């Protein structure tokens, strides 16, 4: 693993990030396949193709939905918004942690936030079908924020102010908008921050 403090090598900005790239490609391919089969804005169609729905997960034990729901998106704008953010910040975290640790953070935040969201919906007696990579992406943001703070507020082209501003705006937008899974965002952020603190090792 390379060092990513103030003395990081500038050519690190241009290194390949294969895991992040693969995640984006998988999301795009899944969306293309679902778009070919039907309407990705149709709730019933998306439920039938792996979206999250707490009665199916908790009562029917369809636990695979905790993972599959993180790779499906409701419409092209939902996909593009998530993938643009992931393309911008995911490679930074992959270079800082390495491929395996990055994948652990991404999947753990995605699955963990889906689980928390399902339990929260059950407790509130809400019956919404949901999906998307935003819980995992908030995990990436949380992990990055911890790492940036440990690197004196800067990591490559990111700083702590940018990340806190993004997270704050996204959560505010979610609270003020309908149809946003805020619990997935918040829990994904917390999971990512915890794992980022545990997995990151800064070379001296």
Annotated model-derived regions:
Residues 2-204:
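A detector for small-residue-rich transmembrane helices and their helix-helix packing motifs
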